[in-house]
Every structure is written in C-alpha cells, then in structure tokens.
Amino acid sequence: MATSAAVRDDEPATKFAKDQLKSIIERIERLEEEKKAISDDIRDVYAESKGNGYDVKALRTIVRMRKQDPNERAEAETILETYMQALGMI
C-alpha cells in the first residue's frame, strides 16, 4: 500500500513534467515553423535580387562578411591576399 501512496504523490509532479515537456516541444515546433518561413523569405529576396540583375553569390558573400567581426575579416582578407600573391594571382 505504501507503493500506491507514493505513486499518487508523484502524479502531480509527473503531470507537471509532462505538461512542461509538451510545452517545450510545442515551442520548438513553433520556432522551427518560423525559421522555415524566414528561410523562405530570404530565398525570395535572393531570387528577387537575381531577377534585378544582382549576382546572388556576391550578395551571399557580402552578407557573410558583414556578420564577421571587422578585425577578423581584415585578418582573413590579408591572409587571402598573401596567398594570392604567393600564387601569382594578383
């Protein structure tokens, strides 16, 4: 009988844990949907820019570069330039 009493004592905690888990899963699912919608919007903007004659690859590169820290970007550009000079590309 002690076992059944212990199970009854755990039921509210178990229900809380189940509700909390369900809430977490639903939040993740909602965020995944939002992420997909944003991804679709970004793809549409790139398609629009391509339709207007812009080079999408260059745009993606610029977006990636703008995300970088200016010092890190400068360092990467210096290294790239050094390598290109060593290969006689510039």
Curated annotation (Swiss-Prot):
InterPro entries: GapR-like (IPR018753), GapR-like_DNA-bd (IPR046367). Pfam families: GapR_DNA-bd. One of its GO terms (molecular function) is DNA binding. Coiled coil: none annotated. It comes from the Bacteria. Belongs to the UPF0335 family. This is UPF0335 protein bsl7135.
